[in-house]
Amino acid sequence: MTINQIVRVIPVLKVNNRNVNQDFYEETLGMKVLVEEGALLSLGDASNVEKIVLEESPSMRSRKVEGPKKLKRIVVKVGETQEIDYLLARKPQTTALYQGANGRAFEVVSPQGDRILVHAEEELESLEPLEEAPLVVVPDDFTGLTAFEVAFLEVNVPDPAQAKKLYETADLTGFVHVKEAQGEDLQLENNVTWDLSTIKVELAAFDVEALRESLGDAVEFVHRKGSFMIVKDTSRIELWFEGKQGRVHISYES
């Protein structure tokens, strides 16, 4: 699928309480709210480019995952290493702390139970466990991350070989790493639980016909104007392919 060069992947996470999760992503992770639209909240950095979306789904519509979640971990790479120290100076509740070649790194768990690793390394292998990070003086003008990307997602699947076939065809293996796990909720429809529901795949150029042909029966929907296409993987996670956007938008006219 080289004709459709991937720019980034944007996870869409279903959450029970958007406000509680919003506070976590802003305060603990230094992310910026870009757009609020109904149940959806778009998060990014100083570039105003969307990187993560939260979708509130109350308990009468969705429920807590039983067993392992589809989303094993989000790995976030930060552009300015020093800003990780600024976040650590806020004394977040970390589950792991590391020292890497470029600086510190840490892992946290969101109020919805999603694991997020924040680092600034070229190679994750450089990370070594760290007992305690030195506290630094935070500049008065630091309000959040200047730049970050979702480097990749780790996704739990019952059958990694089967799941990899689709991700290989879509050239997504660098952005979605499948991990073998067993659980009753791993193959439910994406609206049932508070979990990873959608992966938006932003493409530099979007040749919808070429992509539809390569993905075949996995394609569930193509917008009538060809502006986006929806595929479902073996875990019923939606893959939402679209061309690179000049502005943030988190919903569409069908």
Residue ranges and their predicted role:
Residues 25, 142-188:
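Conserved small-residue-rich
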Residues 1-19, 74, 123-164, 195-199, ...:
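N-terminal beta-strand motif that seeds the catalytic metal site of vicinal oxygen chelate
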Residues 1-49:
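Hydrophobic, helix-prone linear segments
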Residues 16-19, 74-115, 157-162, 182, ...:
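Vicinal oxygen chelate
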Residues 32-68, 115-122, 168-205, 230-249:
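Conserved short beta-strand elements that form part of the metal-binding/catalytic scaffold
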Residues 86-87, 117-120, 129:
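Short, conserved acidic/polar surface loops in the N-terminal third of protein domains
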Residues 70-72:
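A generic structural signal for short beta-strands and their flanking turns/coil linkers
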Residues 28-34, 92-95, 168-175, 216-219:
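Conserved acetyl-CoA-binding loop of GNAT-fold acetyltransferases
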